[in-house]
Amino acid sequence: MELNPTEKDKLLIFTAGLVAERRKARGLKLNYPEAVAFISAALLEGARDGMTVSELMHFGTTLLKRKDVMDGVPEMIAEVQVEATFPDGSKLVTVHQPIV
């Protein structure tokens, strides 16, 4: 299977997001990379499901709460950006203050 760099990046995000999802399901608090991966993967999947950029920007703020992550992680993540593929092309999705 031949993948270009963008496809490899998306596969890595998905894999890391899956690990984070499983850890969260076991009740573990997510660290910085896990939290970013969890949010990023959910945004990519939302775009694939047909959500708009504005819907994803709101959706990204509902995924994790302070209780889901280790101390200090919410302050470390001012924003999450991911380039998602939509029916009309790729667009940058930015979620500001994703963990409240």
Curated annotation (Swiss-Prot):
Q: What is its EC number?
A: 3.5.1.5
Localization, per the record, is: Cytoplasm
Q: Which InterPro entries match?
A: Urease_gamma (IPR012010), Urease_gamma/gamma-beta_su (IPR002026), Urease_gamma_sf (IPR036463), Urease_subunit (IPR050069)
Record protein name field: Urease subunit gamma
| Record's keyword annotation contains Nucleotidyltransferase | no
Output the lineage of the source organism: Bacteria, Pseudomonadati, Pseudomonadota, Gammaproteobacteria, Moraxellales
Q: Which gene is annotated as encoding this protein in its UniProt record?
A: ureA
Q: Which GO terms describe its cellular component?
A: cytoplasm
Q: Which UniProt keywords apply?
A: Cytoplasm, Hydrolase
Give the metabolic or biological pathway: Nitrogen metabolism; urea degradation; CO(2) and NH(3) from urea (urease route): step 1/1
GO process terms (BP): urea catabolic process
Q: Give the protein family.
A: Belongs to the urease gamma subunit family.
